[in-house]
Amino acid sequence: MAKELTFEQQARAKLLEGINKLAKAVKITAGPKGRNALIEKKYGAPLIVNDGVTIAREIELKDPVENMGAKLIAEAAISTNDIAGDGTTTATILTHEIVNKAIEAINNGTNPVNLRIGIENAAKLVSEYLTSVSKPIKSIDEITQVGAISSGSKFIGELIAKAMDIVGPSGVISIDDAKSFDTTLDTTDGLEFKGGYSSPYMVTDSEKMLSELANPKILVSLNKINTVKEILPLLEASVESSAPLLIVASDIAEDVVTALAINKLRGTLNVVSVKCAEFGEAQKNTLEDLAISVNTILVDSAAGIEFKDLELNKLGSAEKVIISKDKTTVINGACHKDVLAKYLNNLKAKSANLTSKYDKERITKRIANLSNGVAVIHVGGATEVAQKELKLRIEDALNSTKAAVEEGIVAGGGIALMNAIEVLKQVKESNPEIALGYEIVRSSLTAPARQIIENAGQNSSKIINNIINSKQLGYGYNAETNEFVNMINNGIIDPTKVTKTALEKACSVAALLITTEVAINDELKEEKPSLNHL
């Protein structure tokens, strides 16, 4: 197909148009008084969302160059969400602000390469500053605050904090649809391990890129699966029984993965294959733990167990399994309580005899993974639309809370980024074009707070100046109550990881975009006039 090429200022102008359109749609969701977006769905009712990354994923623009600009800024949001689980709106706002200012500078003759150096260096300094002021969180109240701020609901914050209290900070928390209007918390047996689906063609939810299996049969193998022939009897039995099949192995040959994916796409076989991402002894331990938790025999040549020794009724099972690209969560495995208790006691006895701190920690994690279970938040709603919207908010809040436990918290409402302005003011840079890159980032750090204030219907310039002139660390504006407060003391906080990732991804995408000199896309075909009216 022929290609269309758009160069230099014309290319940047069109890319910028796409960036501005997507950013305008996402920015309105920022803060406690952020607005909603209504998204048309191909089937069913439209989706009402207050979630930046969901909006970003849905936007497709008609003009191909504009669409490339929109996809680039969406990449900042999606990458932030993938790493930190939240912060997508902040990433979008920052990218939009930095790119607009940088392109204006380039159009006025500034060298984009030098500008890029300044932007990337500034991002590094601000990231280091955020790490230095990060405050670790430990108490249930602090965890509640993070969840409440992210979701805009104290109830959701309390629900997540309670779930974390039950399964531990690194425990497994799953989110599921409720069969009633109420949103509740439940705990069940289960575990999680590293390793996702072998092929994206195995996903059942293309929006979230997840695969979910209800009541699957589960094959667990320490042996590599080299050919389809090795497991063919089990595949045929799975088809005959209409039972979903989960295959977890130390390794799976590419030919096998391809064959399984093709049969999955054809609807012949409801199967997901997973390669355990651990190695060596850790991999063996993970597969042994999984086999116990789902009540099956581990295929292991060293122990004399081969694929031919297993029938479908000897495979394990679980109430539900959720598989992402990099992890697998097993909920309510069919393990016998007495067998699991004996297995855990053996692990504890083994741990007591170990002298290596590393080995002890590894067994402790295995015991916790097997015994803490899974906390399940069942999300209800008066309508399907309300349920979906609430589910998205809970997912964001859970991700934010996990990020806060991992790396601590900073002042929320965009204030931590504003506090970092002083760090960039102190930079002495002899190259004026690199210095301009620093200045662009510095002047963009007020953008998230400004947007939150504007979404609350207030005069952002006046409030921003008040905050800057106060020169108090953590002093900011509570958009919910319309007053100036110490943000951390009043529970208005953001996870450090989320804020850092949003800034880093925004600067990274902006730096790539401003050094773009040509946009290449498929040539648009002219639409033939319709003859329907004749």
Curated annotation (Swiss-Prot):
Top-rank taxon: Bacteria
Cell compartment(s), UniProt: Cytoplasm
GO terms under biological process: protein refolding
Catalytic activity, reaction form: ATP + H2O + a folded polypeptide = ADP + phosphate + an unfolded polypeptide
Entry's transmembrane regions: none
InterPro entries: Chaperonin_Cpn60_CS, Cpn60/GroEL, Cpn60/GroEL/TCP-1, GroEL-like_apical_dom_sf, GROEL-like_equatorial_sf, TCP-1-like_intermed_sf
Residues binding ATP, per UniProt: T29, A30, G31, P32, D86, G87, T88, T89, T90, G413, D494
Example of a GO MF term: ATP-dependent protein folding chaperone
UniProt EC number: 5.6.1.7
UniProt keywords, alphabetically: ATP-binding, Chaperone, Cytoplasm, Isomerase, Nucleotide-binding
One Pfam family per UniProt: Cpn60_TCP1
Annotated Gene Ontology cellular component terms: cytoplasm
UniProt function note: Together with its co-chaperonin GroES, plays an essential role in assisting protein folding. The GroEL-GroES system forms a nano-cage that allows encapsulation of the non-native substrate proteins and provides a physical environment optimized to promote and accelerate protein folding.
Similarity-based family: Belongs to the chaperonin (HSP60) family.
Quaternary assembly: Forms a cylinder of 14 subunits composed of two heptameric rings stacked back-to-back. Interacts with the co-chaperonin GroES.
Name of the featured protein: Chaperonin GroEL
